[in-house]
Swiss-Prot record:
Membrane topology type: Peripheral membrane protein
Pfam families in the record: YidD
NCBIfam families in alphabetical order: membrane protein insertion efficiency factor YidD
Name under which the protein is recorded: Putative membrane protein insertion efficiency factor
Matching PANTHER family: MEMBRANE PROTEIN INSERTION EFFICIENCY FACTOR-RELATED
Known role: Could be involved in insertion of integral membrane proteins into the membrane.
Family: Belongs to the UPF0161 family.
Source species, domain of life: Bacteria
Subcellular location: Cell inner membrane
Translocase recorded as keyword: no
GO terms under cellular component: plasma membrane
Lineage: Bacteria, Pseudomonadati, Pseudomonadota, Alphaproteobacteria, Hyphomicrobiales
Key word Membrane present: yes
Length: 112
């Protein structure tokens, strides 16, 4: 019996479509367990940038989630934003795959 919650029941095509997503999340996992402990935990946002990136890639895939993560990383600096900044529940209405910069919030924590 197949159901959507079980990854083992997915077809090979569905599994192949998840490979980029898994690759992106694996890179974040690698960062969390290697470089992050050496640099220290000093993110200006909640959730941290690595948690944000992991959620964004899981929710929207590597392409859109990667652009959202890039925008978040560029905002996380001494002159950037700080505070609570959650991953959006839905992709922006004007975002298209061929206009990837529209996926990210480039300024402000709660700005659209």
């Amino acid at each position: 019996m197949k159901h959507s919650a079980c990854e083992h029941c997915s077809t090979p095509v569905e599994g192949a479509l998840r490979l980029p997503r898994r690759f992106g999340r694996a890179l974040i996992w690698l960062y969390r367990h290697t470089l992050s402990p050496l640099v220290g935990y000093n993110c200006r946002h909640l959730p941290t940038c690595s948690v944000y990136g992991d959620e964004a890639i899981e929710r929207f895939g590597l392409w859109a989630g990667g652009w959202m993560t890039l925008a978040r990383l560029l905002r996380c600096n001494p002159f950037g934003t700080s505070g609570i900044d959650n991953v959006p529940l839905a992709a922006p209405q004007d975002a298209r795959w061929y206009l990837p910069w529209r996926y990210g919030r480039w300024r402000g924590v709660n700005a659209p």
